[in-house]
Amino acid sequence: MKSVHVVISGRVQGVWYRAWTEGEAAGRGLNGWVRNRSDGTVEAVFSGTETEVAAMLDACKTGPRLASVKEGVFEPCDPPPQGFTKRPSE
């Protein structure tokens, strides 16, 4: 299992990035969470097989249709609880 903490910047709020992330992650069977941050970024944690986490990280680099991703910062982290949730904004 692999777990990664992600911070995505660019035009990623107000474009359904959180909802898209939740759907993509759940569809891949990943555990973790996603939330908007007050600085305009989106933060997430993904945990699952190396293959599925890598595919999710690649997908995050483009995001949903209306998003414009500028940068993604990915760092290893501790595994989250089971399931995938959309957390309230920070």
Question: What annotation goes with each model-predicted range?
Answer:
Residues 1-90:
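Intrinsically disordered, low-complexity, mixed-charge
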